[in-house]
Amino acid sequence: MTTGKGKILILGATGYLGKYMVKASISLGHPTYAYVMPLKKNSDDSKLQLLKEFESLGVTIFYGELSEHDKLVAVFKEVDIVISTLAVPQYLEQLKVIEAIKEAGNIKRFVPSEFGNEVDRVRALPRFQAVLDNKKKIRRATEAAGIPFTFVSANSLTAYFVDYLLHPRQKSEQVTIYGSGDAKAVLNYEEDVAAYTIKAADDPRAANRVLIIKPPKNIVSQLDLVSSWEKTTGSTLKMTHISEQEIIKLSESINFPENIHASILHNIFIAGAQLSFELTQDHDLEASELYPNYNYTSVDEYLKICLVNPPKPKLATYAQPST
């Protein structure tokens, strides 16, 4: 039985964002596939349980390495859309994915792993800029290969950064403010990022465009976030400020991967990079405008979730820079 919807393959399906992507694809009615690394004897039990859950939802699972070119080509010929949610250490491995997509010749849309800042229009401190540069390499390689694409700029993930900034699971009354706390950022709930991505990946309007997820209710500063959390909990938080100069110094002096974390905090919450450019009609699509009937979770609504049962996000992983 055919649904008329594109067959979607997720790379990195068992990772943090990949899990959301698989479930969004299923819920939106797409035949859904996952390409995952072969299981080992010491594979994590949680991964095994997740794969069983995927299978129970009807997900078709392929096992293989990204280095297995012929296997990738064969798998890609079975689907219409490839969405990568590979982690930072694997970004450049997507060059192998691009080569396989090019040879397969049937993929209608490729969404490379980004889901952060708009890499072509922001600059960052060196440690974070290196991450952005790798994403740019994948964009250029995708374009050069002539593969239909949608690049997704998700800005910041709500569950991840609310946990990092407000510590709702620990019920902490102390928070750290980076810089003045006034710079605006965009926080989007992971479920919404996945839903918008799946919608755009099978939408002709989003072909060869940048999807920027920037809903108006999710544009907040650190001080806005603290104020909203105080109203939600009825408590008063004690704020400690770290200056821009201190953050820059930390990004230059502390060990990996904390130096990348410092660079990211500077870029988002001090430089305000996510609000530093205007969207263009011929290049960009704003997700909440493209899909006005989709009810996204606002930051304030997410904080109410945290009051009852705060999610536990997974910390991001980064590749050790070569020397």
Swiss-Prot record:
Changing Y91I: Confers some eugenol synthase activity. InterPro entries: NAD(P)-bd_dom_sf, NmrA-like, NmrA-type/Isoflavone_red_sf, PCBER-like. This is Isoeugenol synthase 1. It comes from Petunia hybrida (Petunia). SUPFAM superfamilies: NAD(P)-binding Rossmann-fold domains. Optimum pH is 6.5. Pathway: Aromatic compound metabolism; phenylpropanoid biosynthesis. Inhibited by zinc and copper ions. Repressed by 4-bromo-cinnamyl acetate. Expressed in flowers, especially in corolla and tubes of petals, probably in both epidermal and mesophyll cell layers. Involved in the biosynthesis of the floral volatile isoeugenol. Catalyzes the synthesis of the phenylpropene isoeugenol from coniferyl acetate. Phenylpropenes are the primary constituents of various essential plant oils. They are produced as antimicrobial and antianimal compounds, or as floral attractants of pollinators. Isoeugenol is a characteristic aromatic constituent of spices and a floral volatile compound. Induction: Up-regulated by EOBII. Triggered by EOBI in flowers via the regulation of its promoter. Circadian-regulation with peak levels occurring at the end of the light period in flowers; this expression is monitored by LHY binding and repression to cis-regulatory evening elements in its promoter. Signal peptide: none annotated. The record marks V88, Y91 as: Confers substrate specificity. Disruption phenotype: Accumulation of eugenol but reduced isoeugenol levels in flowers. Keywords: NADP, Nucleotide-binding, Oxidoreductase, Phenylpropanoid metabolism. The active site is at K135 (proton donor/acceptor). GO terms for biological process: circadian rhythm; phenylpropanoid biosynthetic process. One of its GO terms (molecular function) is nucleotide binding. It catalyses: (E)-isoeugenol + acetate + NADP(+) = (E)-coniferyl acetate + NADPH. NADP(+) binds at residues 14-17, 36-47, 88-90, 113-115, 135, 155-157.
